[in-house]
């Protein structure tokens, strides 16, 4: 069965998300673009070729051009020249969504500066997948990617990030995971919840949630392997003054509809939207009561 169809793509740069591990996680639109683009570029040409072969997408004489973090400005210029000449260019990173802790930023920046069309075929992302399954707050999150490998620099960066009232999303290698957990344990109170999400969407997927010390104990007994996403529970004070909350909500309701005011205040205070909406309705009712 052929899952792709050939399209007439307009000239432009098409950023195509690819599976993290399970080849079946690719979207039909991604297959259409990979089958139809005039030019194919990839962070890892071997991985891209394997994915294309799995899904029966014919190359039809097209070669896959390598583009990665070590590519030169001249490599970007050649890719963008294809677009200027009326061709479509599809780009994939090794896995997941291009630019999200993956190459592609400078390519997109140069394309935008040249007023070229840039489009995305969205799909898998390790960051979003980890947030989905870990059970930590998702109303506000801060994507960090990889921290510095050196301990001093890593601890300094963590000290800046850990007070944020947002779930932190980090990528880490298996060999540095225990060092990272140890640093977190050193800097924050040990009741802070951390999730280690390993090999997401793959056969040996594992999600462990606990305090830094609990996770250190777990990974002392069982060495971590594969691709790892680490999520850290939000910092900041969890004590919210009710009068401050109501004052902010009343102020927002002066200029916004109740639903929009509730959404804005819920985001600002990192609280459930439904709870804030119910409070807004009560405040509105009280204001109408003589």
Identify the residue ranges that each predicted region occupies.
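Glycine-rich, flexible N-terminal cofactor/catalytic loop recognition
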Residues: 1-67
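General beta-strand structural signal in soluble alpha/beta enzymes
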Residues: 42, 120-123, 170, 196
């Amino acid at each position: 069965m052929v899952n792709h169809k050939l399209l007439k793509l307009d000239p432009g740069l098409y950023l195509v998300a690819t599976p993290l591990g399970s080849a079946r996680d690719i979207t039909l639109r991604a297959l259409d673009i990979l089958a139809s683009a005039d030019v194919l570029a990839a962070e890892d040409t071997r991985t891209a070729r394997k994915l294309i072969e799995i899904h029966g997408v014919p190359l039809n004489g097209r070669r896959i051009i390598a583009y990665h973090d070590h590519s030169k400005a001249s490599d970007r210029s050649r890719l963008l020249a294809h677009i200027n000449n009326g061709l479509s260019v599809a780009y994939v990173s090794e896995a997941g969504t291009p630019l999200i802790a993956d190459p592609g930023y400078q390519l997109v920046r140069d394309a935008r500066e040249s007023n070229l069309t840039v489009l995305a075929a969205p799909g898998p992302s390790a960051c979003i997948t980890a947030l989905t399954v870990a059970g930590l707050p998702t109303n506000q999150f801060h994507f960090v990617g990889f921290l510095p490998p050196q301990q001093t620099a890593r601890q300094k960066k963590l000290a800046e990030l850990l007070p944020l009232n947002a779930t932190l999303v980090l990528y880490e290698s298996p060999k540095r995971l225990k060092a990272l957990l140890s640093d977190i344990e050193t800097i924050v109170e040990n009741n802070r919840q951390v999730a280690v999400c390993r090999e997401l969407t793959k056969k040996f997927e594992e999600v462990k949630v606990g305090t830094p010390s609990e996770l250190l104990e777990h990974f002392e007994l069982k060495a971590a392997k594969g691709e790892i996403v680490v999520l850290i529970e939000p910092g900041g004070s969890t004590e919210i003054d009710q009068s401050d909350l109501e004052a902010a909500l009343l102020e927002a309701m002066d200029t916004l509809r109740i639903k929009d005011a509730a959404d804005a205040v819920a985001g600002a205070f990192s609280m459930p939207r439904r709870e804030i909406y119910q409070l807004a309705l009560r405040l509105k009712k009280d204001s109408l009561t003589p």
